[in-house]
Amino acid sequence: MTGIIAHRGYSKLFPENTMLAFKEAAKFDITGIELDVQLTKDSHVIICHDETIDRTSNGSGLIKDMTLEDLKSLYFYGKFKGQVEENADIQIPTLEEFFQWFKPLDIMVNIELKTNIFRYEGLVEKVNELIQQFDLFDRVILSSFQHHTMNTAKKVNPKLKTGLLTVSGTLQPGNYTASHGHDYYHPFFMTLEAEDMENLTANKIGVNTYTVNSTEDMKKLIDAKVTNIITDDVALGLQVLNASK
């Protein structure tokens, strides 16, 4: 059965990658949450999609040049400025803070490591330490567009579940993913073809597609039997999924 993963939390209705968006998503019968991590100047693992905070907060600058204290002084309301209360739930969360809240829940989390532009040396190791600290290996999937980052993750700890993100698709994606020792393939949904699903299924590779926000596209992917659909619209995803049963 296909599951629904909340992209950056319930990001259609709440500020992305905030505890508010995560808590609102968890009120629904979701399979999991997707989020993005980066490293601060003082080496804290924080949750944010962009390398800069300009789009999502009332501040400006690169995350790598700011301390956690700098970042915690800001509010990450994004496009919802004036629509949400300025409190701790829309301050930037650390991955540790997220795990403290997440640990008692019965859902999984997909953590994208944002190593596309900056390498963030030590990020993989710090994320692994936090997963180990909270004993969450069976509930976490790491993913990245930088496949060497996922190769590093498997070397750091073979227990880590890893997924390969792609924008334009991959020839024989099941063979490719399996040959590199990874567990999941995360394609942009429009690039996923029937023969890709056959190849992935034959190699026992899970398929988590992003970012799917229309009823028609969700129906097609449910029919294709993808593992999970990553969506901004949690309510729509569950509505379409339940109607397909």
Q: Where do the protein language model's features map onto the residues?
A:
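Phosphate-group recognition and catalysis centered on beta-loop-alpha active-site segments
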Residues: M1-K245
